[in-house]
Amino acid sequence: MILVRRELGDVLRDLRLQKGQTLRQVASKASVALGYLSEVERGQKEASSEILFAVAEALDVPLSVILSEVGERVAALEGFAPLRPIPDTVPDEFLSDFAAK
């Protein structure tokens, strides 16, 4: 069974290590108990949205980036291809077809 809390914990730990921060530093910046954050990173505790937001701010990473990474990891575990970003422009070939009509 896929546990989202494990994937979330892995993402948070990976980001923290990439940023070169200790668990203690992030817990302090986020005003979260060190032991609790450790349990979240190990996938043993579910984090509330408020805790996630505080940790994201402490890591200086948008919460949306964290959640997107978790979603991609869960999709991979489920055997789905990673989600592709939706383009914010209309491809030229569609514009030329539209203009011709």
Task: Set out the residue ranges of the language-model regions.
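Short alpha-helical DNA-recognition segment
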Residues: T22-S38
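Hydrophobic micro-packing sites on short alpha-helices
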Residues: S48-A56, I66
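Residues within the helices of the helix-turn-helix
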Residues: R13, R24, F53
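A short, Lys/Arg-rich alpha-helix, primarily the initiator
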Residues: M1-Q18
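Residue-level signal for the short linker/turn that defines the boundary of a DNA-recognition helix
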Residues: D10, G20-Q21, A47-E50
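Short, charged recognition helix plus adjacent turn
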Residues: S68-K101
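The alpha-helix within a helix-turn-helix
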Residues: R16, A27, A56
